[in-house]
Amino acid sequence: MSTVFATEASRVCKRIDAVRRKDSLVFPIFTDPHTHTLTEDGMENLFAALASLANTIKPDGVIALGDNLAMLGRECHATNDEIAGLLRGIFDRCAAMFACPVYPVNGNHDGIGTDFFKPDFWYAVSRAYDQNTAVREGESAYYYVDFPGVRMVCLSLPSDSELAAEHPTPAWEYGDAQLRWLAHTALACDCPVLLVMHVPFYYEYLGDPVPMLGTWNGTHATESTIAALCGWIADRDVAKEIFAAFQNHTVYDNAAVGIHMAPSGARACLIAALSGHMHNDSFWLPGEKRNTGDVESGGTNALPCAQFVTASSNPAVNPDLRGHETVPATLDIAVVTPCERTITLVRYGDGEDRMWHW
């Protein structure tokens, strides 16, 4: 098995070298392992894949796109300490392999009881791995990082849950505080911005939430409700308007949320959005519409930039790959090159490289 990883790492390193320039930023990306333990095959293979690259690609950061955990808290009992310990175990392994920071973003499975998310819980887990390079809003789960010529903005979605409410919300929203931070702080820059978030921005709830919200009780819900609610982003239109104003260098005001956003600088633009969540690959052009009636594969890219969705690092979770993979782990390595205005996702494992010129 070690030969498989070494051979794949050699191929990937040659591909990275072919597109890398002096100003390129390099980020290994993994997402959606959905593990119960650190020793399951999917995690062992992920760690082996990362280790095969650790001494060769010299990355600027490792991006963990979320949904590290399986259905802990619903499939089986798991305490908050156990959930936090498993998350720390994953990030500890990554940090031990690479000299660079690790940048985790939370998925809907990475919180207390899963699908419920408290930002202070995630902050306490994730802040130890960014090597003090991330700029956060208090103890937030969202943050930005400045690199030479590029800002990376890591969003939290889900952002918060009101567990004490009679009918708790499933937390699929950015929330007013995060949206104000996005407009006033994270996008207050005059440089290209790389967006990072677990849930793709095109993916949205297609039905009527009112009857389903009434079934929520504490941290538990029926399986059908979970399936239907995944992807419903209640305040996505406000986020869309913020991104459009940033891209078009215009003023944006939203009194209801408390936003007055000044025009962005002349060099400001969106590079692309990086996401996971779907378990298989996809690539979306700005404004692209696809199978809009299908919650699994359809939607509209409402962002004025391309969106890359990275497949699960565990091929057993990927419906397009399960059972016929040739490499037992899947990664993307993002190569962001400001001088050429390109972002290339080099594939480690089964799948194709993808490139966008912003």
Residue ranges, per PLM feature:
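His/acidic metal-ligating clusters that form di-metal
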Residues: 51-61, 96, 151-153, 165-289
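Residue-level marker for buried hydrophobic side chains located in beta-strands
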Residues: 27-29, 62-64, 104, 195, ...
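Active-site glycine-centered loops adjacent to acidic/histidine catalytic or metal-binding residues
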Residues: 32, 66-67, 107-108, 198, ...
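Short active-site segment of divalent metal-dependent hydrolases/proteases
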Residues: 35, 69-70, 110, 201, ...
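Extended active-site neighborhood of metal-dependent phosphoesterases/phosphodiesterases
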Residues: 5-15, 74-187, 248, 266, ...
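Short, flexible/disordered intra-domain loops and linkers
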Residues: 38-42, 73-84, 114-120, 164-170, ...
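N-terminal active-site segment of His-dependent metallophosphoesterases
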Residues: 1-81
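Acidic, His/Gly-rich catalytic cores of divalent-metal-dependent hydrolytic chemistry
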Residues: 338-358
